[in-house]
Amino acid sequence: MTSEQFEYHLTGKEILEKEFKTGLRGYNPEDVDEFLDMVIKDYSTFTQEIEALQAENIRLVQELDNAPVRTTTQPAPTFQAAAQPAGTTNFDILKRLSNLEKHVFGNKLDDNE
């Protein structure tokens, strides 16, 4: 985004130089001045932040334009090796399960058969 895409209605200087009319009850000029001072500081900070972000955006776009196109042609990793630890097969798992059942249930399994 460029600064041309934003329409600014006020500048810090315009805020500083703004004159307010007083009404019947008026206002406290010191309160207005203090408030406007805060607005001016914030406005200046926002302007600096916008300029910094625009500069960073331009830099990143240029960096992206200059970066080589990367294609990922690596094969997808296989999870088969991670699923079974070394030396463990389905037979080993079934054998361990059988031993565990015998230990937990004891002879109750043999009586039910």
From Swiss-Prot:
<keyword id="KW-0131">Cell cycle</keyword>
<dbReference type="InterPro" id="IPR007793">
    <property type="entry name" value="DivIVA_fam"/>
</dbReference>
<keyword id="KW-0133">Cell shape</keyword>
<comment type="similarity">
    <text>Belongs to the GpsB family.</text>
</comment>
<keyword id="KW-0963">Cytoplasm</keyword>
<dbReference type="InterPro" id="IPR019933">
    <property type="entry name" value="DivIVA_domain"/>
</dbReference>
<feature type="coiled-coil region">
    <location>
        <begin position="36"/>
        <end position="68"/>
    </location>
</feature>
<dbReference type="InterPro" id="IPR011229">
    <property type="entry name" value="Cell_cycle_GpsB"/>
</dbReference>
<dbReference type="GO" id="GO:0008360">
    <property type="term" value="P:regulation of cell shape"/>
</dbReference>
<dbReference type="GO" id="GO:0005737">
    <property type="term" value="C:cytoplasm"/>
</dbReference>
<dbReference type="GO" id="GO:0051301">
    <property type="term" value="P:cell division"/>
</dbReference>
<keyword id="KW-0132">Cell division</keyword>
<dbReference type="Pfam" id="PF05103">
    <property type="entry name" value="DivIVA"/>
</dbReference>
<comment type="function">
    <text>Divisome component that associates with the complex late in its assembly, after the Z-ring is formed, and is dependent on DivIC and PBP2B for its recruitment to the divisome. Together with EzrA, is a key component of the system that regulates PBP1 localization during cell cycle progression. Its main role could be the removal of PBP1 from the cell pole after pole maturation is completed. Also contributes to the recruitment of PBP1 to the division complex. Not essential for septum formation.</text>
</comment>
<protein>
    <recommendedName>
        <fullName>Cell cycle protein GpsB</fullName>
    </recommendedName>
</protein>
<keyword id="KW-0175">Coiled coil</keyword>
<comment type="subunit">
    <text>Forms polymers through the coiled coil domains. Interacts with PBP1, MreC and EzrA.</text>
</comment>
